[in-house]
Structures are given as C-alpha cells and as structure tokens.
C-alpha cells in the first residue's frame, strides 16, 4: 500500500494531507496549538483516529503515539554526533536509513520491512512517499513518519 504524505503550504500550524495511490484522501493531519508538536490524525470521514504528541521538557525530543485514546508507543531522538538517530518503542519496530533528510525504512522486530519512506525532491512543500507492506501498519507507520518530520522541522527552525 502506498501513501503520499504532503504538507499543506499555507497553514498556520502543521497540516498534512495523506493520499492513497488513486489520489483519494486517506487521512488529514491537523496541528494544534500546544507546548511542543501535537498532531491529530483524522480519517477520510473526519473521525479522529490517532495523535502524535511531543513530550516537552525532555533532554532530546520524544513523541508519544496514540491510536484513538490508546497509547501505542513512542519515538525518541538519540544523541548521535554526526547523523540523527531515533529509537522506536512501538510494535517492536526499528528505523534505519538516511535520517539526514530523506530515505529510511521501518523494520519489524523480525527485521522485515514494515514501511519504506522516501522524500520527493523538487516539491513546493514536504512530500514523502510511504510504501507500507501490510495495510494494517499504515496508521502506525504514518505516525512514525510524522514524528520524524516534526523533529526535523524543529531542528531546522
């Protein structure tokens, strides 16, 4: 299953549209005013299905992931001197690849690819292609990508 993750150009808070391969909107992500990033994820019908919330007052950025109201894990920035690294505490997943900006994989506890993420270049706004192996992992994979993108935005500001 492929998803196209596109940030809206003119939005006050972080806002994204997530599209299916056929161009239909799968999810809409709306940032909320809060301490740290708080991203609410809505399905195509407008129902809230998940939240990515930055935990504030931590030494390194940490994002909590919620499916509905249920906590499913977190993603934390690691202290690495030469390239960004992340620890994922969600579904036993790991993230590997080029975090500097663009291409990485989300791996299962067994080392299988759960999702492949690549940034599309020469776009007006941040645009990523997320290729998910199992459609059941689409929303958690999207939340990991949102957390990494939010951390990169904070780092670049």
What are these regions (language model features)?
Residues 1-157:
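Intrinsically disordered, low-complexity proline/glycine-rich segments
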